[in-house]
Amino acid sequence: MATSDSRSSPSSSDTEFADPNPSSDPETNSERVQSQLESMNLSQPSEVSDGSHTEFSGGGDDNDDEVASANGNEGGVSNGGLLREGVAGTSGGEVLLRAENPVEMEAGEEPPSPTSSGYDGERGSSGGATSTYKADDGSEDEIREANVDGDTASQHEAAWLPGKRHVDEDDASTSWRKRKKHFFILSNSGKPIYSRYGDEHKLAGFSATLQAIISFVENGGDRVNLVKAGNHQVVFLVKGPIYLVCISCTDETYEYLRGQLDLLYGQMILILTKSIDRCFEKNAKFDMTPLLGGTDAVFSSLVHSFSWNPATFLHAYTCLPLPYALRQATGTILQEVCASGVLFSLLMCRHKVVSLAGAQKASLHPDDLLLLSNFVMSSESFRTSESFSPICLPRYNAQAFLHAYVHFFDDDTYVILLTTRSDAFHHLKDCRVRLEAVLLKSNILSVVQRSIAEGGMRVEDVPIDRRRRSSTTNQEQDSPGPDISVGTGGPFGLWHFMYRSIYLDQYISSEFSPPVTSHRQQKSLYRAYQKLYASMHVKGLGPHKTQYRRDENYTLLCWVTPDFELYAAFDPLADKAMAIKICNQVCQRVKDVENEVFLQGASPFSW
């Protein structure tokens, strides 16, 4: 593994990699879009600094269900300037919060007794041998989940079995203690509300222990955020009378784990609204279980999405690739529906947006869209018949109910119509009938099905600029060896990329291609992206514009401009100069197809 100094100086970010046309005024961004894309020429390579960081090792990214390892441009897209070589490999330091009296187990110490509600998640198999994919070598001897082969057209959505698993486990079970990642929701009286693994009723004692820790710290006039115990992080989130806790040894950052708890809380609010607080004010021992009956599958589906859905940390949504004219026609139909008194109308295919429209001056946050689509996709009742259900959008208005009309046209495609009126079922049904007639007549539903089957962008589709390659690699052209621009993955070792449009709050993620084929490899890469994203957005340490990281698993490159963010993964032996050039090609490719992969003019989602 290559090692070198990974320090980043502010002067480097301000000079060498500064935007050619810096401007903090959003209106000027659109004026400089065209000029920024006129030239894709890069400066000559400067000194290379390979930021080698073991924190991106996939060794701790085995399946959460397995035994824990002990080692453990306005209206469009712009390039915002060219990425130049000489990227400093900055260290993305995690925020470490002080924990009072952290609990650690000494070497050789016996695990606590089953009655002590102890958590023994670090015992088990050790990490696999170092290789290109060390994350794929973890042990699966003791605990292994059923793995259902997913649809090849939707590689990002790993196989998920509806409902909670391992309901027979409790805190006395050895298997339960060895889970790598737990989520708990409980009330301020210690009553369990949700647990990722096991039966909530059997975990009442463990929930009471968590509640006691939180209350003890609060009684001292403080608030507990994070406790570190060995390889474990215990992350707490207090939302009034609701306590959320994550216990993890997956090496994810504190910020990301806390963000996951925020989403879990938002999912609960989507079902119940924040008015649930008043119930606890009247009765501190209020039992929420009856109100959340049958929603275990919703929470479990959301937890599962943390390992495959970039929307959970990018806070953006993704669209199904469609011809521009067809998407615009669909948007026109949905806008006509909104004109009849509907707040939001959305046509979705799985977790991807086909098109949407909203009432004037109404805005919808991507997190609300994520939670809403998860609620619909994980609830079997929505698939069997048209439904009219009260829901709450926590980022839109956490105090009020909206009413959602949901109808599935087929197994993947569905429409959501949101209204403030509780008596609008028949009106929304009439809107849906008219909408469906137009979609069938124009053959839109067939095109949607064909698009989801074909998948999204692929790294193999990224074009290679032969002129640029010839100007920098003349010696390679003269050599009799194989063409290094062609091989596994995309050009010059490109394995995967994610592109987020900041103005549109949308992202596009390439389909996984060899060698990133297994669920565990994909999961490991996403966690590397999460850490890279967190390190680029740490308050007080930026602003960072570029990062270049190399370890035994990947070469990771991140590029942030006022208009977009790009995250790319390359072969660990990829050449840095060529990786930077390929990133420019990716941005150009996204620009070329932006009308097909992004929803343009999505004013309801601009805030």
From Swiss-Prot:
The record's similarity note reads: Belongs to the MON1/SAND family.
Region annotation (Disordered) ranges: 1-173, 463-486
Tell me the keywords, alphabetical order: Endosome, Guanine-nucleotide releasing factor
The reply to whether Cytoplasm figures as a keyword in the UniProt entry is: no
Q: In which residue ranges is the amino acid composition biased (Low complexity)?
A: 1-14
The task this protein performs is described as: Plays an important role in membrane trafficking through the secretory apparatus. In complex with CCZ1, acts as a guanine exchange factor (GEF) for RABG3F of the Rab7 protein family. Promotes the exchange of GDP to GTP, converting RABG3F from an inactive GDP-bound form into an active GTP-bound form. The RABG3F active form is involved in protein trafficking from prevacuolar compartments (PVCs) to vacuoles. May serve as a linker between Rab5 and Rab7 protein families in PVCs and mediate PVC maturation.
A single GO CC term for this protein reads:
endosome
Q: Where is the composition biased (Polar residues)?
A: 21-55
Main localization of the protein? other
Q: Which InterPro entries match?
A: FUZ/MON1/HPS1_longin_1, FUZ/MON1/HPS1_longin_2, FUZ/MON1/HPS1_longin_3, Mon1
- State what protein this is by name: Vacuolar fusion protein MON1 homolog
- Report, as the record phrases it, the tissue specificity of this protein: Widely expressed at stable levels.
**Gene Ontology biological-process annotations:** intracellular protein transport; late endosome to vacuole transport; plant organ development; protein targeting to vacuole; vacuole organization
Localization per Swiss-Prot or TrEMBL:
Endosome; Prevacuolar compartment
Annotated Gene Ontology MF terms?
guanyl-nucleotide exchange factor activity
Q: How does it assemble?
A: Interacts with CCZ1A, CCZ1B and RABF2B.
Q: Which PANTHER family match?
A: SAND PROTEIN-RELATED, VACUOLAR FUSION PROTEIN MON1 HOMOLOG
